């Protein structure tokens, strides 16, 4: 996440739009402050125009406006859309409560009747496009509700149906823009962290997380200098942390995975 400034213009080098805005507000609310004093958000609605061979569709998170678009094809398409929305929202709640926000620290945490049953209910065996076809019959609308898997580089024709959560999130929670760009959110987090007594060390490369006896974190190797510590929160990608940062035996890493 960074910003490029040129000739009075600002460009985000990473993501620009925000989905699920409550996640961005939560660190500030949890630390006892009003997030509006740190950053501003603006809802984008409609959040995109989709141009098909036949017409232009304004994609909106306002259900009344969206209903008009679907009903302009056929009333049955709106009924199918509501069935789709109900189905994928129930899967989202299942995934969030039983998988996304749950820690799996051992085999028994996953391999039990309750968890396996919840995994089955996600019904990820069909592709995203096939799942949409069950409820929405018009070709334009099928493509309209399925291309969002491309956000994460997955084809709707081969990716599992669970990725239909992405357009559902857009439609239910809306699409938002942080005023000043996404980098403004990083500055807001920095400000609040420092207010709480935190210290940020800039322009430093973490080379290794030192683990004593393959059991306990004892330090960080930063710019070829050892810094003592007894706990580390690694925000890098998990595979990168395991293969490049964690200084411990490979067989111990396998057990952590």
Annotated model-derived regions:
Residues 13, 143-145, 202, 222, ...:
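General beta-strand structural signal in soluble alpha/beta enzymes
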Residues 179-187, 191, 195, 209-210, ...:
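Glycine-rich loop(s) and the adjacent beta-strand/alpha-helix scaffold that form part
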């Amino acid at each position: 996440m960074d910003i490029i400034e040129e000739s009075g213009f600002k460009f985000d080098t990473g993501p620009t739009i925000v989905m699920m805005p409550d996640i961005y507000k939560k660190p500030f609310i949890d630390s006892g402050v009003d997030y509006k004093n740190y950053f501003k958000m603006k809802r984008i609605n409609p959040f995109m125009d989709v141009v098909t061979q036949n017409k232009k569709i304004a994609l909106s998170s306002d259900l009344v406006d969206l209903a008009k678009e679907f009903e302009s094809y056929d009333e049955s398409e709106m009924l199918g859309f509501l069935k789709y929305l109900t189905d994928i929202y129930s899967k989202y709640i299942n995934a969030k409560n039983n998988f996304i926000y749950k820690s799996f620290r051992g085999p028994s945490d996953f391999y039990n009747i309750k968890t396996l049953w919840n995994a089955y209910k996600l019904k990820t065996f069909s592709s995203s496009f096939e799942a949409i076809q069950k409820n929405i019959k018009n070709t334009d609308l099928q493509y309209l509700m399925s291309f969002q898997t491309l956000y994460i580089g997955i084809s709707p024709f081969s990716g599992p149906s669970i990725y239909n959560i992405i357009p559902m999130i857009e439609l239910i929670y809306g699409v938002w823009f942080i005023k000043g760009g996404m980098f403004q959110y990083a500055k807001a987090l920095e400000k609040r962290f420092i207010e709480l007594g935190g210290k940020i060390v800039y322009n430093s490369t973490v080379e290794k997380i030192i683990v004593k006896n393959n059991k306990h974190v004892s330090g960080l190797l930063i710019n070829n200098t050892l810094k003592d510590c007894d706990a580390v929160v690694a925000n890098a990608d998990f595979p990168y942390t395991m293969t490049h940062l964690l200084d411990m035996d490979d067989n111990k890493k396998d057990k952590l995975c």
